[in-house]
Amino acid sequence: ARTDADAADLLTSDIDDRDKKFVTGERTSEGFFQVNCGVEQGIDRGLSYAPYADLIWMETSNPDLEYARKFAEGIHAKFPGKMLAYNCSPSFNWAAKLTVPEMETFREELAKMGYKFQFITLAGFHALNTAMFELALAYKERGMAGYSELQEREFALQAKGFRAVKHQSFVGTGYFDAVQTVVTAGNSSTTALAGSTEAEQFH
């Protein structure tokens, strides 16, 4: 369960008695109720969710271990060992907030506090857009040599377990070829991998 973010200072309703200690009595022009936000509110909501949720998560505004520790201690004081979640957010400017050694151990330090599920929201979005921008720029400036450089990086990464060089095999084409071969008793002429450029050029 995700509590309010530590910066969430608005509620749509003040009906819940558990919120009343944080409600300021002020309302916005849209009708929202203003609240005193922060880690105490996050802990309070987390404790309300804890009996029912597998994981408790409060969205934070900075990668701050002491802040994370305060939330963890607040939850564990009443629910020892309760598993916590932490968003290692791409909205944080990591290098501006932490040193390289701090970043290298950030994950492990969180784990010691009980943050068992750690994730980077939108990591794929940023990786995809950065990679495609770099590829488009290389292709613009160097033509197919720019793409070939990407391909050579793929080849080198195979030693570390990268498998998407052979994109047809990677997405399961071989499986569907096998199914088709069984269904047609070996007489299919439209399987994909046999005789393909992938089979001939990528070994």
Language-model regions, residue ranges each:
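C-terminal helical cap(s) of enzyme catalytic domains, especially alpha/beta-barrels
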Residues: 129-145
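Flexible C-terminal active-site loop/helix
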Residues: 143-194
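Alpha/beta enzyme core
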Residues: 1-119, 132-133, 137, 176-203
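Short acidic/histidine-rich active-site segments
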Residues: 120-125
